[in-house]
Amino acid sequence: MASNEEILAGLAEIVNEETGLAPEAVELDKSFTDDLDIDSISMMTIVVNAEEKFGVRIPDEEVKNLKTVGDAVSYIASAQA
């Protein structure tokens, strides 16, 4: 099971690959849409890549609840437990 720091680093890498944003810009309190300017199509790609990287399943109905990077980190951590 990955630590929250490892999950954050992994998500930052995925966001960087999808959007070109610097990994250090991906912080727990950042909103995917408002702060990081990630649209719904990019978000789905990020979710699929996160599922593969962390070995978890994030149902479509849960994706809409992942407003911030911290929300995603918490969800992935609990899904791995």
UniProtKB/Swiss-Prot annotation:
Main location: cytoplasm
Stored InterPro entries: ACP (IPR003231), ACP-like_sf (IPR036736), PP-bd_ACP (IPR009081)
Associated pathway: Lipid metabolism; fatty acid biosynthesis
Chain segments annotated as coiled-coil in the UniProt record: none
PROSITE patterns recorded: CARRIER (PS50075)
Subcellular location: Cytoplasm
Modifications made to the protein after synthesis: 4'-phosphopantetheine is transferred from CoA to a specific serine of apo-ACP by AcpS. This modification is essential for activity because fatty acids are bound in thioester linkage to the sulfhydryl of the prosthetic group.
Protein keywords: Cytoplasm, Fatty acid biosynthesis, Fatty acid metabolism, Lipid biosynthesis, Lipid metabolism, Phosphopantetheine, Phosphoprotein
Role summary: Carrier of the growing fatty acid chain in fatty acid biosynthesis.
PANTHER family: ACYL CARRIER PROTEIN, CARRIER DOMAIN-CONTAINING PROTEIN
Family, per entry: Belongs to the acyl carrier protein (ACP) family.
Protein name (database record): Acyl carrier protein
Native source organism of the sequence: Renibacterium salmoninarum (strain ATCC 33209 / DSM 20767 / JCM 11484 / NBRC 15589 / NCIMB 2235)
Lineage summary: Bacteria, Bacillati, Actinomycetota, Actinomycetes, Micrococcales
